[in-house]
């Protein structure tokens, strides 16, 4: 039996989807029982969150009880902050479980997890030196920034010491964490791409040809590091409608930017907010191209992978792990709307590019392949 551990973020994002898909994979493809022990940052409150960070976790005995009650042999830990911390992992080990630590982001070193602040990529925090995050107030709240800086400096080594093995989503993520002096046991750090359930289904419908009804699609949390403003400017230059699915702190500013371009032929921008899976599938089926204009060093690029799995050509920034997934023709410099516009004009409606992308993402994220690799990692953890 595998017990998943995850502290949900205030704003739901790709990591929550990956956790859900991995739980599905364990149950349906590996054939093991799986349960999720979950807490939510939204429910904690600032005082209790700070307590969890500074103490290295709240109520670790809840985790120990769950391990014993369910007979879990492996604890698969995802986001631990602010409520679980290293004490949850130690409690699981004491109760008899082996620990697999899954680092979806850079949160072991970076207080915001994405190595991005004040409009640019940032790698100032290294190892236990997390003071730059406090000085720059990366969390947007001095008390919160102080709590994260102290917690990372105090407890990051304790977290790692509890892990029998560590999973990261890409080669780039592993090397970035190494460059950040993350105190990881590198011989036990393994790369595992997330599974995409959609790749188990029928092939995606044929890509609609580019034409007056064409639109580009961005599926993203609306935050500065995601570069949605670049997509707005690029689609305005390319004369193609842009649909934006997602929400976040930058929505108001992005809507204002889009209003400035109204009246330009073909430059309509529509903000759809969060959409459910069924609506997202419909949007992808009718789009001509998907854009992933990130400014930050993505640890994987889930939005790109899901669009490729849906049969869309993808244009993405040449940052982070995106070049491991997206072919060279679909990569552009981050923050360059004219380069992005040019790629949109070349690739919108390109069925050959879509077919190549589908083949690439199948090689990386097919559920059967990911299941085999994950089952082997669980066996390694059990044998330590």
Protein language model regions, located:
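Short alpha-helical donor nucleotide-sugar binding micro-motif in glycosyltransferases
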Residues: 274-275, 282-287
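Donor nucleotide-sugar binding/catalytic pocket of nucleotide-sugar-dependent glycosyltransferases
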Residues: 127-202
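Short alpha-helical segment that forms part of, or immediately flanks, the ligand-binding pocket
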Residues: 281, 299, 304-309, 323-324
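A charged, aromatic-enriched C-terminal amphipathic alpha-helix characteristic of glycosyltransferases
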Residues: 349-379
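A conserved mid-protein helix/loop that constitutes part of the nucleotide-sugar donor-binding site
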Residues: 16-17, 214-237, 249-253, 338
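Acidic donor-binding loop of glycosyltransferase active sites
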Residues: 285-299, 312
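Conserved acidic donor-binding segment of nucleotide-sugar-dependent glycosyltransferases
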Residues: 329-338, 344-350
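Nucleotide-activated donor-binding/catalytic signature segment of Leloir-type glycosyltransferases, i.e.
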Residues: 255-278
């Amino acid at each position: 039996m595998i017990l998943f551990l995850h502290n949900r973020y205030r704003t739901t994002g790709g990591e929550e989807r990956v956790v859900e898909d991995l739980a599905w994979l364990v149950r349906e493809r590996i054939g093991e029982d799986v349960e999720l022990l979950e807490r939510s940052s939204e429910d904690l409150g600032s005082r209790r969150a700070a307590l969890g960070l500074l103490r290295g976790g709240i109520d670790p005995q809840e985790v120990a009880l769950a391990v014993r009650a369910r007979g879990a042999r492996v604890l698969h830990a995802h986001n631990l902050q602010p409520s679980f911390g290293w004490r949850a992992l130690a409690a699981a080990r004491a109760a008899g479980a082996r620990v697999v630590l899954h680092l979806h982001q850079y949160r072991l070193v970076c207080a915001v997890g994405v190595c991005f602040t004040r409009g640019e990529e940032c790698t100032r925090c290294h190892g236990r030196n997390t003071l730059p995050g406090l000085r720059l107030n990366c969390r947007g709240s001095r008390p919160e920034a102080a709590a994260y800086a102290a917690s990372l400096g105090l407890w990051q080594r304790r977290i790692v010491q509890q892990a029998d093995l560590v999973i990261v989503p890409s080669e780039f993520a592993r090397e970035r964490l190494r460059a950040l002096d993350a105190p990881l046991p590198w011989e036990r750090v393994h790369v595992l791409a997330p599974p995409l359930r959609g790749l188990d289904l029928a092939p995606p419908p044929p890509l609609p040809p580019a034409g007056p009804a064409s639109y580009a699609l961005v599926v993203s949390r609306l935050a500065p590091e995601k570069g949605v403003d670049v997509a707005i400017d690029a689609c305005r230059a390319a004369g193609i409608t842009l649909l934006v699915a997602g929400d976040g702190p930058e929505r108001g500013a992005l809507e204002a930017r889009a209003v400035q371009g109204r009246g330009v032929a073909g430059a309509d921008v529509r903000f759809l907010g969060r959409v459910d899976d069924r609506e997202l599938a419909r949007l992808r089926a009718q789009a001509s191209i998907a854009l992933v204009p990130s400014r930050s060093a993505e640890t994987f690029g889930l939005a790109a992978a899901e669009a490729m799995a849906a049969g869309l050509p993808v244009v993405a920034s040449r940052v982070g792990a995106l070049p491991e997934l997206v072919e060279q023709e679909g990569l552009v410099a981050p923050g360059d709307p004219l380069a992005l516009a040019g790629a949109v004009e070349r690739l919108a409606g390109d069925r050959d590019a879509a077919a190549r992308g589908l083949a690439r993402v199948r090689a990386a994220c097919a559920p059967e392949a990911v299941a085999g690799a994950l089952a082997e990692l669980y066996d390694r953890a059990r044998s330590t």
